[in-house]
UniProtKB/Swiss-Prot annotation:
Region (Disordered): 23-90, 144-189, 201-236, 301-406, 478-499, 790-831
Extent of Pro residues compositional bias: 201-232, 377-391
Comment, domains: The protein kinase domain is predicted to be catalytically inactive.
Name listed for the protein in its UniProt record: Probable inactive serine/threonine-protein kinase DDB_G0280131
Length: 1192
């Protein structure tokens, strides 16, 4: 119950703070108890306490009224706290209800308004107004340590941002009194700042003075005292001047938080530039007595309060002027910032009380200098109620010659700010509301720039087949005659057509030169060719090797549509898609460019598969293909030529799909070749084309959609399991151009995958599943995919007979049940319905209900799972933190693991792991570690959902905490005799070379964890062979001879003990330059009497190395017999060490050179006792040693 007690104490502290009208925020330790804001808890964190008090009639101070949102949050807290057993009510405290309430939308909104320690949105206004942007930056706290170090918290966080309880209430000068000064901060480690702020003086700023000047008031009552200039170093709470002097306080138009650019690089760069602009303002020099001539500004008749560097006070006057009851504070440049905002998105009212007339700051919405020179009437400022304007007085300010330079520098910086941020969205209205939402189905997240997001939001233009061309080809006239007539027509108008083509080509080249994706073609060696064109090397582009593909049958009419499609294809990114680098239209030739991948295509890899790991590799490759295709289909992009030649694999066997899109060009090529007798024989990869494609080419009605790619994927999946057998080599029957192949059953294919292939290869596109469904099936655990039994031999023979007798369209009518024989008259529709039902059951294998689980708790956790899904669907940093913290709370309780498994929390953690935030990834890795430690089923699910792929990526992390928890996870997956499958997967995914490279890490704790992980992995024979082949033994030997720590010796020796029995490793040690030092190191381990584990490791290693003659001399010189006597005790029950020690002595006794040493040692007597050992093997070894020693 410790976690519940901590959560309860935190909630009690927040409730008490809310009832007292104050909120304490701890910036660096959000989990500590904040019951007393003035106590020193020994931490170095800085606490900022907001407190606002106003004098009442009796001279006592009272707290301000809380907002409606605070009251609502307080009541919700009180209602939950009332269920705690410490109260009078019964029922107890339920932290699941607390999680649900805290994760509600209303709770999120209230926490943003009332608790500044929450992560708030970093926003830029629609016109980039500097004042409102500064306001947003001041109110922003970053929980992320990296961002928090970059952004400095402002002193304006010490003000209460809540609105006054009654905005229309005014305070006259007769009953106003001077507020007491705040007490100095206590001299403690935790600096507590309490701001008790006086009411400000409202000052209106007119245009340059044109009215009559009034004399200055007496210095004794209305004299203005200026603060000294601030120091040259930049402070964290510098202010900015007003946006427009002539137009009063502008009404700022803001971007909604849903559309705000949160924590992106552009926002941080813009914020940094704002800091530079603010710092350029500098300080206001102190006036030199009466020597400086004042400059005129217009103020109200209320005297300006005297401002000093240390305190802020206001004087009372008898003038019947009214001011609003607002909070104010002094900034280093002498400005008073009034904040009547009730929420984060309200405008900021900045009013200047310094003697310096502020320079108008031009913004994107302000008029040009020429327009501002003309006199314009000041726009009235909107107020809640109509109030009479107070009389004004002209006050002079001193002028400094440095002001002009500062103003000029500010104007230059603003211009630079506009130019450098011109690519940002300035208004939410620029976003297309009809644009589809980008859905990432991959296991990797790509943060996109605003420009890339705009390109991805464009919907692909739907292209339909050219029916007119097809009708002409399929008409009554002969095909050759049609071509001849067309050529004759072209010749008759050749001059005009050539001129039009030249003009059109020049226009296209002029248009594409302005595109960012334009690349000048530089063809080189030809790599290959296919149906649609020829592929060649194209040199270097942006430090990467690229290849170019020249497309066949390109028409000028398709150019405008291709421009749109190129922009969309260039913008999309996916880890398994070979991105389009650019394109060009040169000399009536269309060329596309992609990155050059060193590797092989899918055909070559499948033919060289290892039968032992065949199923796991096929499922992984299929999953990556399905993930990439699902991503393309989410943009309505059809590949239309998915076959092994267009699927590349690099040296790490990672999938890259190329030649996607451009369906109009592919259709045109296929039509010309299909309808031409001369080109028809040049058609390649026809077995991967769906039947509806041939129907379109043959003149039938209809078209095709994304389901043609599903058909191609079904053929690919079948050929992966068939390996050497190609579908085109089988017996076939051609109908309307489409070839029906008689596919034999595959004995190595799981029955589940076989049914999936049948659905994908259905002649009816509506029966084929989507790639989203396919992806979910392939991501199921391996035991789930293999749980269905394959048909018996008798059923397989029956299926083969049915396939030979029936037409291929009726192949799907065969039985899909693994039980008894089925009715042969079952229709195709019924069988397909049964397949669909079984697939639906397969999609949700974890949706089982354990009767032993609490139903009420199950419902609550399912509700929490739905809320977490909603938060992840809107991946702001705030939402991701809340989702991660919620899962952390649930994982801490081991009793919740079964509920989390049933509610599908593991895929949610995988989705969080895709986010590019180190703290989120670290939290997810810890959650996986907790779940895998206590549940074997979750470990298998983690492995089958490609969790090991994620660990291979995090092994390359520069963050030591992420690297450490990754190594811990790998150790958990490898620890145990039944974890052989996990070790094999780590080997296949390339984990061994990564771990060997990390052995040189500078952190010793990480090196120890790597050694332990390698020790567990080296239990596998295949891992041992790979480790030795990659040179890992040399690194272990080097670490061993230089080790001076017993703990490090234990880890290194444990890892070497797994491979030292191999003959290749023994030869490597005996022939290496570390031989003598290694043998002496093992001797020192054998003589270590404090650690028995080290002695055993040394004994085993010496037994492996004693066969080398040079090593034998080192052993005899070190008096090895004395170290072995303790193992020759006849009363010892440990037979293994005794046999190992006898082996060492026996090898030494075989060499006559060592007989004198053995005779001189005290070994004869212990051997005589061992002759009576009950173990026959020990008796034979002792007799052999005594015979050798006594005979020589």
């Amino acid at each position: 119950m410790s976690e519940l007690d901590d959560l309860l104490n935190e909630m009690l502290a927040e409730s008490e703070a809310a009832l007292n009208g104050q909120s304490t925020i701890n910036l660096n330790n959000n989990n500590s108890n904040n019951n007393n804001n003035n106590n020193n808890n020994g931490n170095s964190a800085t606490k900022i306490s907001f407190q606002e008090q106003m004098p009442n009639g009796n001279g006592n101070s009272s707290t301000t009224t809380t907002t409606a949102a605070q009251q609502s949050a307080t009541e919700k807290r009180k209602s939950r706290l009332s269920q705690h057993p410490s109260n009078l009510n019964e029922g107890g405290f339920d932290y699941l209800d607390t999680l649900l309430n805290d994760m509600s939308d209303e709770s999120i909104r209230n926490s943003i308004k009332t608790d500044n320690s929450r992560i708030k949105s970093l926003r830029l206004t629609s016109t980039f107004d500097l004042e409102s942007t500064l306001k947003d930056l001041e109110e922003t706290f970053m929980k992320d340590s990296s961002i928090q170090n970059k952004r400095k918290p402002s002193s304006y966080l010490s003000k209460n941002l809540s609105p006054p309880s009654n905005p229309s209430n005014i305070i006259s000068n007769n009953n106003a009194s001077t507020l007491p000064l705040p007490p100095p901060p206590s001299q403690q480690d935790d600096v507590v700042i309490i701001a008790k702020l006086p009411p400000p003086v409202s000052i209106s700023l007119p245009p340059p003075p044109t009215t009559e000047e009034l004399p200055l008031p007496p210095p004794s009552t209305e004299e203005l005292q200026l603060p000294p200039p601030p120091p040259t170093t930049t402070t964290a709470d510098e202010q900015i001047l007003t946006d427009s002097v002539k137009n009063g306080n502008p009404i700022l138009k803001r971007v909604s938080s849903e559309r705000a650019i949160i924590l992106t690089k552009e926002a941080i760069d813009a914020a940094d530039l704002l800091d530079e602009m603010i710092e350029s303002f500098g300080g206001i020099p102190e006036p030199n007595g009466n020597n400086s001539l004042p400059k005129e500004i217009k103020t109200t008749s209320i005297p300006t309060p005297i401002v000093t560097p240390s305190t802020t006070t206001s004087t009372n006057t008898t003038t019947a002027a009214t001011v609003n009851k607002l909070n104010a504070s002094k900034s280093p440049n002498g400005t008073l910032t009034t904040r009547p905002a009730a929420k984060l998105g309200a405008p900021v009212d900045i009013q200047v009380s310094s003697p310096k007339a502020p320079t108008p700051i031009p913004t994107l919405s302000s008029p040009s200098p020429s327009q501002s020179a003309a006199p314009q009437p000041a726009a009235p400022q909107p107020t809640p109620t109509s109030q009479p304007q107070p009389p004004t007085t002209t006050v002079s300010t001193p002028v400094s010659p440095t002001f002009k330079d500062s103003d000029q520098l500010l104007d230059d910086m603003i211009s630079h700010f506009k130019e450098s941020n011109s690519n940002l969205l300035t208004s939410s209205s620029n976003l297309d509301p009809s644009a589809p939402k980008v859905v990432y189905t991959s296991q990797q997240f790509y943060p996109l720039s605003v420009e890339e997001q705009s390109l991805q939001s464009k919907v692909k233009v739907q292209l339909t087949p050219d029916e007119q061309v097809i009708q002409k080809i399929l008409g009554n006239n002969d095909l050759d005659d049609d071509i001849t007539n067309k050529n004759n027509d072209n010749n008759s108008n050749g001059n005009n057509n050539n001129k039009e083509l030249i003009d059109e080509q020049n226009q296209i080249e002029q248009q594409q030169s302005d595109k960012s994706w334009y690349i000048k073609a530089q063809p080189s060696d030809i790599i290959g060719s296919g149906n649609n064109g020829t592929t060649q090397r194209a040199g270097i582009h942006k430090d990467k090797r690229i290849v170019m593909k020249q497309w066949n049958f390109i028409t000028s009419q398709a150019t405008p549509m291709l421009f749109n499609e190129i922009e969309q294809l260039v913008a999309i990114k996916h880890p398994n898609i070979l991105a389009l680098a650019g394109a060009s239209f040169d000399n009536q030739t269309f060329t596309t460019f992609t990155e050059y991948i060193t590797g092989s295509n899918l055909d070559i890899v499948i033919k060289n598969l290892d039968e032992k790991n065949e199923l796991q590799l096929i499922l992984r490759l299929s999953e990556e293909i399905a993930s990439a295709m699902s991503f393309l289909h989410s943009f309505n992009i059809v590949h239309r030529s998915l076959h092994p030649k267009n699927i590349l694999l690099n040296s790490d066997l990672k999938i890259y799909i190329k030649d996607y899109g451009f369906t109009s060009l592919k259709d045109e090529t296929l039509k010309k070749k299909f309808m031409s007798f001369q080109l028809k024989n040049q058609l390649l990869h026809t077995q991967y084309l769906a039947p509806e494609l041939f129907n379109v080419l043959s003149g039938s009605k209809g078209g095709y959609d994304t389901k043609v790619d599903v058909f191609s994927f079904g053929v690919l999946l079948w050929e992966m399991f068939a390996r050497d057998i190609k579908l085109s080599d089988l017996k076939s029957n051609t109908v309307n151009g489409y070839t029906h192949y008689l596919r034999p059953p595959l004995p190595n294919c799981p029955f589940t995958i076989e049914k999936l292939i049948k659905l994908c290869l259905s002649t009816d596109p509506s029966v084929r599943p989507t790639f989203t469904t396919i992806l979910k099936i392939l991501r199921q655990p391996l035991h789930t995919i293999q749980r269905f039994n394959k048909p018996t031999q008798q059923q397989q023979q029956q299926q083969q007979q049915d396939q030979q007798q029936q037409q291929p369209e009726q192949q799907l009518t065969s039985s899909t049940s693994s039980t008894s024989t089925q009715d042969s008259l079952v229709s195709q529709e019924q069988v397909e319905e049964k397949i669909k039902n079984e697939m639906n059951n397969l999609l949700n294998p974890n949706k089982r209900f354990n009767e032993s689980l609490d139903p009420e708790k199950r419902v609550k956790i399912e509700k929490i799972a739905n809320v977490v899904k909603d938060l992840i669907s809107q991946p702001t940093l705030l939402n991701l933190h809340r989702a991660s913290q919620t899962i952390d709370q649930l994982c801490k309780n081991v009793e919740n693991i079964e509920y989390l498994l049933e509610a599908d929390f593991v895929p949610l953690i995988f989705q969080l792991m895709d986010q590019p935030y180190d703290e989120i990834q670290l939290s997810c890795l810890k959650q996986f570690s907790t779940l895998i430690e206590h549940n074997e089923e979750i470990m298998n699910l983690f492995r089958n959902l490609l969790g090991i792929n994620i660990l291979m990526e995090t092994l390359n992390s520069q963050k030591e905490n992420i690297l450490f928890i990754t190594l811990r996870l790998l150790s958990q997956l490898s620890n145990g005799a039944d974890r052989e499958e996990n070790r094999e997967q780590i080997l296949i995914k390339g984990g061994i070379p990564l771990l060997i490279n990390l052995l040189s890490h500078q952190n010793e704790l990480i090196r120890l964890q790597i050694l332990w992980c390698l020790t567990l992995l080296l239990e596998s024979n295949s891992v041992q062979v790979e480790f030795v082949k990659l040179g890992g033994v040399n690194q272990l030997l080097d670490m061993m001879v230089h080790s001076i720590n017993s703990g490090f010796d234990l880890r290194v020796a444990s890892a070497l003990a797994r491979v030292i029995s191999l003959k290749s490793v023994q030869d490597q040690i005996n022939l290496g330059h570390y031989r003598e030092r290694v043998v002496k190191k093992y001797l020192s381990l054998l003589g270590d009497t404090q650690f028995e584990a080290l002695r055993m490791l040394g004994l085993e290693a010496i037994a492996c190395l004693v066969s080398n003659k040079d090593s034998q001399f080192i052993l005899t010189a070190s008096n090895i017999v004395d170290l072995l006597l303790s193992y020759l005790d006849p009363n010892s029950t440990s037979m293994a060490p005794q046999m190992t020690a006898l082996k060492i002595i026996l090898v030494l006794s075989v060499n006559p050179i060592h007989i004198p040493y053995l005779k001189s040692s005290n070994i004869i007597e212990p051997l005589q006792y061992l002759k009576s050992s009950p173990h026959p093997s020990i008796q034979k070894a002792v007799e052999k040693i005594l015979m050798l020693v006594s005979s020589k």
